[in-house]
Regions:
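Short cationic amphipathic helices and targeting signals
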Residues: 163-169
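Charged, alpha-helical interface segments at or near domain boundaries
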Residues: 23-132
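Short beta-strand
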Residues: 156-160
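Generic recognition of flexible, low-complexity loop/linker segments
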Residues: 145-146, 153-155
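C-terminal structured domains
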Residues: 169-216
Length: 216
């Protein structure tokens, strides 16, 4: 394993997280207010222990849930239950549809970095973005299309923090190589998302494993 590269990856992820936090702090000082009513909805993916009023379970996930939010003056805000009911009369399905429209436009503007081994074979892809909608883009067709040529139809995805998405072709051996480093990214995160591993394909997204469990 290339430990110097993994150290670089952890530092790079930390700087991206700090940049994300700094951007949110700068937005909070703007004099122009951004109303919740005019802000695009954000499908948040977050640790289960974080509290919010509007939550939806992720299939087979034990530590991660969906939540409903939007971008406000101080960063990502959660919808209160009553606010959510007033804004989305048709419920979660309406909210998710609108949130993914925004996420689709975000993923279209992102170029992944492909990490390769010494022979030039792609190990995994890295996405870094300070846009809070980037994480929910994993639920879009455009996200799957972006990686289909290199990784096929079944994607394994890790989302350690709000600024980072790691994507690889389904395969236990490849994941085991980087499992410890990916889990450390989750532990070091200012805005953690998930310690779980997700399978994404045309059928949807669901959890298939946990980065904390020992490699096999």
């Amino acid at each position: 394993m290339n430990w110097s590269f993994i150290s670089f990856l952890l530092i790079f992820s930390l700087f991206a997280e700090l940049g994300h936090a700094q951007r949110l702090d700068q937005e909070s000082t703007k004099k122009t207010s951004k109303s919740q009513k005019s802000s695009p909805p954000i499908l948040i993916i977050q640790p289960k222990y974080m509290r919010s009023e509007v939550v939806m379970m992720i299939p087979d996930a034990r530590h991660t849930v969906y939540s409903a939010g939007y971008l406000g003056e101080l960063g990502v805000n959660y919808f209160k239950a009553e606010e959510f009911r007033q804004k989305f009369s048709k419920g979660w399905k309406e909210f998710k549809k609108k949130a993914l429209i925004n996420a689709t436009s975000v993923i279209k503007s992102v170029q992944p970095e492909y990490i390769k081994d010494s022979t030039g074979k792609i190990e995994y892809a890295l996405i870094q973005s300070d846009n809070p909608s980037i994480v929910s883009s994993v639920n879009t067709q455009q996200f799957r299309d972006l990686f289909k040529e290199n990784f096929g139809s079944d994607l394994w995805v890790i989302i350690p923090n709000r600024s980072t998405i790691l994507v690889m072709q389904a395969g236990k051996n490849r994941l085991n190589t980087y499992k410890k480093a990916f889990y450390q990214m989750f532990l070091d995160a200012t805005y953690p998302v998930s310690r779980e591993v997700f399978l994404i394909n045309s059928k949807g997204l669901w959890a298939i494993g946990d980065l904390k469990t020992p490699s096999q």
